[in-house]
């Protein structure tokens, strides 16, 4: 018999898996790489109502991930419960069609504790701060600790308990870039939260990203956050969008066609503040620019979709990176028509401004040269025609 034959021996009996093994299996879906762990921990902090998050990593998150927040915190009673699989405070009515938080499955913390060395220190308004540790699935006793209101979660030696996973990780540089991209996306989704990302590799402390808290989540605040995270060029070459159809609101900033990119790396989609990489949304954005941009170029955009929780199912992917809308064609239509309209309006405005400026310049030139000969007049006419045919978005 081939050694890879998958036939089950009659001697094997069905048995219940150990809780530690279950958590390790779950970790394979929840935590693919250090950036996945960072995402889960930051989302927990945001769900806890924090206004400031500091993320510290070392060696691309392989040896250290530490997330510090000023959220509600957990009591000494909640700490051990939070480490149980499928224990959560985010489904009060057990309704998966009415999710108003990032997390809801109760899988992140037990999964992280199963594959790494996890330490949680938390302080709420109750009886002070407490600490609990998990090493490869083994939970320690709770003990008193010191810290202000909020939670600190420290994950060391990710995948030490499942060493086979380590060889699938990329270089430290690549893993750090993935973490940086994750933090950028989450910071764009929640402009009313301050973010600081620090690389502590080699015992040093290098600040990679720092953005201050914006006053709200308005379009103006979103633009400020985008400018700080993506740069002034994006801000200067983008236009705002704010359209509503029935119970769905589409807001954000989309680039001018002249600001085309070589890849789709600068495309951000948020559904009820949750960042997603959904093929349907990516395709809709592509379709919106099909008349303005070559196929080998990509638009830059930050698109926020707000809708009722029961209008979208976020429980269709282990990493929650994909969603399923009740009316997918309606969402696509809203994106395509909404973006095309704002681009057309901006193009008309730019064209009118350009034509007015060109006409003024030509009149000034004619006024200064009253005796222009026929050759000069012909030249001026050609210049005027060229100006009119200029790109709308320059």
Predicted regions and their residues:
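N-terminal phosphate-binding caps/lids of nucleotide- and nucleic-acid-binding domains
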Residues: 1-392
């Amino acid at each position: 018999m081939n050694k890879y034959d998958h036939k089950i021996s009659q001697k094997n009996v069905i048995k219940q898996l150990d809780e530690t093994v279950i958590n390790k299996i779950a970790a394979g879906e929840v935590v693919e790489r250090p950036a996945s762990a960072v995402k889960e921990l930051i989302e927990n902090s945001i769900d806890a109502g924090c206004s400031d998050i500091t993320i510290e990593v070392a060696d691309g998150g392989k040896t250290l991930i530490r997330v510090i927040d000023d959220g509600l915190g957990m009591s000494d009673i909640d700490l051990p419960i939070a480490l149980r699989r499928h224990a959560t405070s985010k489904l009060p009515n057990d309704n998966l069609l009415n999710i108003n938080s990032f997390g809801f499955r109760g899988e992140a913390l037990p999964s992280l504790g199963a594959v790494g060395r996890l330490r949680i220190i938390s302080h709420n308004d109750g009886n002070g701060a407490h600490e609990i540790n998990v090493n490869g699935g083994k939970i320690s006793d709770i003990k008193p600790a010191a810290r202000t209101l909020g939670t600190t979660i420290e994950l060391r030696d990710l995948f030490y308990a499942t060493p086979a996973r380590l060889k699938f990780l990329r270089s430290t540089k690549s893993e750090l870039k993935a973490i940086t991209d994750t933090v950028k996306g989450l910071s764009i989704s929640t402009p009313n939260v301050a973010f600081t990302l620090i690389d502590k590799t080699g015992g040093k402390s290098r600040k990679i990203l720092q953005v201050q808290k914006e006053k709200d989540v308005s379009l103006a605040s979103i633009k400020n956050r985008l400018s700080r995270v993506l740069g002034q060029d994006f801000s200067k070459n983008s236009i705002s969008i704010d359209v509503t159809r029935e119970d769905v609101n589409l807001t954000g900033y989309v680039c001018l066609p002249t600001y085309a990119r070589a890849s789709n790396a600068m495309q951000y989609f948020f559904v009820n503040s949750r960042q997603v990489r959904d093929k349907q949304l990516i395709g809709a954005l592509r379709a919106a620019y099909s008349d303005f941009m070559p196929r080998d170029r990509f638009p830059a955009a930050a698109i926020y979709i707000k809708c009722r929780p029961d209008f979208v199912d976020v429980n269709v992917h282990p990493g929650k990176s994909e969603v399923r809308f009740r009316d997918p064609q309606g969402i696509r239509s809203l994106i395509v028509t909404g973006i095309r309209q704002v681009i057309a309006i901006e193009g008309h405005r730019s064209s009118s401004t350009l034509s007015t400026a060109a006409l003024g310049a030509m009149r000034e030139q004619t006024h200064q040269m009253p005796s222009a000969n026929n050759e000069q007049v012909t030249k001026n006419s050609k210049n005027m025609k060229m100006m009119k045919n200029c790109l709308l978005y320059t």
